[in-house]
Amino acid sequence: MILTKAQYEEIAQCLVSVPPTRQSLRKLKQRFPSQSQATLLSIFSQEYQKHIKRTHAKHHTPEAIESYYQRYLNGVGKNGAAPVLLELANEVDYAPSLMARIILERFLQGHEQTPPSKSVINSMLRDPSQIPDGVLANQVYQCIVNDCCYGPLVDCIKHAIGYEHEVLLRDLLLKKNLSFLDEDQLRAKGYDKTPDFILQVPVAVEGHIIHWIESKASFGDECSHHAYLHGQFWSYWNRFGPGLVIYWYGFIQELDCNRERGILLKASFPTDIVTLCHSTA
C-alpha cells in the first residue's frame, strides 16, 4: 500500500494519544478500513518506537527506576496476581517489555552480589521461568505477552515475518527463472554488507536497470527509509549498481525519489520485469 505523505501523517496523528494495545490497533483499522492490517500495524509499531526513543531517558533516571520499583513492590504486596507491572507501564506510557526489564534489573541488583549481565537479563526475559522469584516471573510474563511493539516475543515474530518475505521473494525470482545469489552465498564470497539477492543477469523494471533486490517486511516511513538509505541502500548501490527495494507493507510515495540515481521502491514484486532478451519475465 503506497500512501502519500498527507495520508501517512493522518494515520500517524491518530496514534499520538493512543496506548500501544491491540484494542488501539482495532480502532485504527476501523478508522482507516481501506488500509491493510499489516500496513497499519507496521506504522503503529514504528510511530510508537519513535515515541519511546523520545521519552526513554526520563524512565531511566535513578529516581524514576526507584519510584517504579517501589510502586511495583507495593502493588504485588497487595495482590501478587494482579497485572501490577503491566498497569504501571501503561500508566507511565512506557512499553511493558521495557518496564519489565527495568524492574528485573533492579530486582537482581538487590538480590545478586554482582550486577546482572545483559545476556542474563535477555535470557530471563525470553524465558521468565528463569527468574528466581515466582511473582516477578509472572509479572514479566504478562508484560511480554501483552506488548505488541517490544520484547522477545515481538522480536521473534518480526524475524519470522522478515524471513517469510525473503522466502516469498526467492520463490518469485525462481518462478520468473531469474538467476541470483542470495545473502549467504554473497557472504561466503567475502562480502560483508549485502542485499538479500543479487541478480546474476540484470533486469529492467519500469525502465530502470536492476542489479539487486532488498526485501523489507515493514512500511517505509521517512525515518526508517533514510536510515536504510545511509546504512544499506547507498552501500549496495556503490558496490553492485542500481537496485530495487520492496517494502511489502507499503511506503510513503514521496520517498520514491531516487529512481534516476539508482534506487527504485515498490510495494510488491514487479509484474513488468524485462530481461536482456527484451521479453517480459
UniProtKB/Swiss-Prot annotation:
Superkingdom of origin: Eukaryota
Pfam family, one: TPD
Main location: nucleus
Keyword Transferase attached: no
InterPro entries (UniProt xref): CDIN1
Keyword annotations from UniProtKB, A to Z: Cytoplasm, Nucleus, Phosphoprotein
Record bears the keyword Phosphoprotein: yes
GO biological process, one term: erythrocyte differentiation
Localization terms from the record: Nucleus; Cytoplasm
Location of Phosphothreonine modifications: T114
Cellular component per GO, a single term: nucleus
PANTHER family in the record: CDAN1-INTERACTING NUCLEASE 1 (PTHR31661:SF1), SIMILAR TO CDNA SEQUENCE BC052040 (PTHR31661)
The protein's role, per its UniProt record: Plays a role in erythroid cell differentiation.
Identification of the protein by name: CDAN1-interacting nuclease 1
Source lineage: Eukaryota, Metazoa, Chordata, Craniata, Vertebrata
Gene that this sequence comes from: Cdin1
